[in-house]
Curated annotation (Swiss-Prot):
One of its GO terms (cellular component) is plasma membrane. Translocates 4-amino-4-deoxy-L-arabinose-phosphoundecaprenol (alpha-L-Ara4N-phosphoundecaprenol) from the cytoplasmic to the periplasmic side of the inner membrane. InterPro entries: EamA_dom, Flippase_ArnE, Small_drug/metabolite_transptr. This is Probable 4-amino-4-deoxy-L-arabinose-phosphoundecaprenol flippase subunit ArnE. It comes from Serratia proteamaculans (strain 568). One of its GO terms (molecular function) is carbohydrate derivative transmembrane transporter activity. Its main location: membrane. Belongs to the ArnE family. Pathway: Bacterial outer membrane biogenesis; lipopolysaccharide biosynthesis. Heterodimer of ArnE and ArnF. Keywords: Cell inner membrane, Cell membrane, Lipid A biosynthesis, Lipid biosynthesis, Lipid metabolism, Lipopolysaccharide biosynthesis, Membrane, Transmembrane, Transmembrane helix, Transport.
Length: 115
């Protein structure tokens, strides 16, 4: 079962990476027209690769864990993307936002404890 949870973390990292690549692709539209297309396509290709790998690993997760446990654990994506957006893109986050992230992490912790 621990392997299943480690794979869920890998899925989260891959899909988070894919989301960050999509953000970079969107930002690349601000580049000069002569380089915009190439840069955007590279970021989008990397996003598709990461998201595709994430889906392949996710299928493996579904063989190992019940969906009712695996899917909520993907909420880790909210945490990872929030942290990455803050530090990589300097996006503002409020205290309320961080309380939400902490609530998600607490929920993941509560679900991982065996009764």
């Amino acid at each position: 079962m621990i392997v299943g949870y480690l794979l869920v973390v890998l899925v989260s990292l891959l899909t988070c990476g894919g989301q960050l690549c999509q953000k970079q692709a969107a930002l690349s539209w601000q580049l000069p027209p002569e380089v915009r297309r190439g840069v955007t396509l590279r970021w989008l290709a990397l996003a598709v690769l990461l998201l595709g790998l994430g889906m392949a690993v996710w299928l493996n997760v579904l063989q190992r864990l019940p969906l009712s446990l695996a899917y909520p654990t993907l909420s880790l994506n909210f945490v990872l993307v929030t942290l990455a957006a803050r530090w990589l893109f300097n996006e503002p986050t409020t205290a309320r936002h961080w309380y939400g992230v902490a609530s998600i992490m607490l929920g993941i912790l509560l679900m991982s404890i065996n009764p």
